[in-house]
From Swiss-Prot:
Residues 1-28 have a biased composition (Basic residues). The gene is rpl15. One of its GO terms (biological process) is translation. This is Large ribosomal subunit protein uL15. Keywords: Ribonucleoprotein, Ribosomal protein, RNA-binding, rRNA-binding. It holds the Pfam family Ribosomal_L27A. Part of the 50S ribosomal subunit. SUPFAM superfamilies: Ribosomal proteins L15p and L18e. GO terms for cellular component: cytosolic large ribosomal subunit. Residues 29-38 have a biased composition (Gly residues). Residues 1-43 are annotated as: Disordered. PROSITE patterns: RIBOSOMAL_L15 (PS00475). Binds to the 23S rRNA.
Amino acid sequence: MIRRRKKVRKLRGSHTHGWGCKKKHRGGGSKGGRGMAGTGKRKDQKWTWTIKYAPDRLGKRGFHRPKAVQYIPKVINLNDIDENFELFKDAGIIYEEDGKLVFDATALGVDKILGTGKLTRALVVKAYYVTPKAEEKIKAAGGEVLLA
């Protein structure tokens, strides 16, 4: 009967498991650094790898508009107007004109009225821009929209 050693037993008892000297298979120093070390702009160690697998890793690409030029509109939802009604009235942002309550979004520094939430009062809304959904809800509450 042939008794064959299992492959699992290979290299048992060997100090180095085929790596020669113990130092050769020790830390990151034998591999050119750990992970992606050495792939920086000086492009020495792993440059061939970088060119093949990560060509966009270094250098700039695209364009970013300066923050000063970017326009992000200031917005307010209908539910915010409804919840802070008294606060706006005290501040003079909501005032009475010809027997109607007027909400002046331009005085608040808001550019756009959004349609999230409900409006429970009839308001005349002055704004630079009102979304169609918001306009629909304002009119349903008995108010009107005036674009500034």
